[in-house]
């Protein structure tokens, strides 16, 4: 591995590890709850906004989609990870720094969720946001990495003059 791509690789491993450790902590803490305690591990309420840590499981893709296609979904996810990793490796020098950061975030999130599927057979979600009666589906840090990476990539592609140099 060239030394130029080493920071990207280490960042990828660090982010995936942070995701896995956060899920492990939530699962271990939820095992310590007594049957008579509330289902959430943490709550913060500010006016009509609330943030909760509630362990839940997702057997499908985003928002539980395609849960009935576990094996094809896993194969698709692994192919996406391998494709992204290969693309990042081959094009590393020619990619704009923002593109590398975005792809690293997406790849770290994908690795985090695939690690869950291989370990638990489903993805561990635990972050829950609500505002008034609006409730966002629960998610995890890997999902946040994927979302932030995607937004960075879209922002770079559409809103910068250098977007033609992106790939």
Curated annotation (Swiss-Prot):
Enzyme Commission number(s) from the entry: 3.4.23.36
Keyword Protease recorded: yes
One example GO MF annotation: aspartic-type endopeptidase activity
Name the UniProt record assigns to this protein: Lipoprotein signal peptidase
GO CC annotations on file: plasma membrane
Cysteines paired by S-S bonds: none
Gene designation: lspA
Alphabetic keyword roster: Aspartyl protease, Cell inner membrane, Cell membrane, Hydrolase, Membrane, Protease, Transmembrane, Transmembrane helix
Major location (coarse): membrane
Active site residues per record: 125, 143
Domain of life: Bacteria
Cellular location(s): Cell inner membrane
UniProt similarity note: Belongs to the peptidase A8 family.
Recorded metabolic or biological pathway in which this protein acts: Protein modification; lipoprotein biosynthesis (signal peptide cleavage)
InterPro entries, alphabetized: Peptidase_A8
């Amino acid at each position: 591995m060239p030394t130029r791509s080493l920071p990207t690789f280490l960042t990828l491993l660090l982010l995936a590890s942070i995701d896995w450790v956060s899920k492990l902590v939530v699962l271990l803490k939820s095992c310590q709850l007594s049957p008579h305690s509330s289902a959430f591990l943490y709550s913060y309420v500010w006016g009509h906004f609330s943030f909760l840590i509630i362990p839940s499981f997702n057997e499908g893709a985003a928002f539980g989609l395609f849960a009935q296609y576990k094996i094809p979904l896993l194969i698709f996810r692994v192919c996406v990870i391998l494709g992204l990793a290969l693309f990042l490796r081959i094009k590393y020098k020619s990619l704009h720094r923002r593109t590398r950061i975005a792809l690293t975030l997406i790849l770290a999130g994908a690795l985090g969720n695939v690690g869950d599927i291989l370990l638990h057979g489903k993805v561990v979600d635990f972050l829950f946001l609500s505002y008034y009666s609006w409730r966002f589906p629960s998610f995890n840090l890997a999902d946040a990495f994927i979302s932030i990476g995607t937004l960075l990539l879209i922002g770079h592609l559409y809103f910068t003059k250098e977007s033609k140099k992106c790939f």
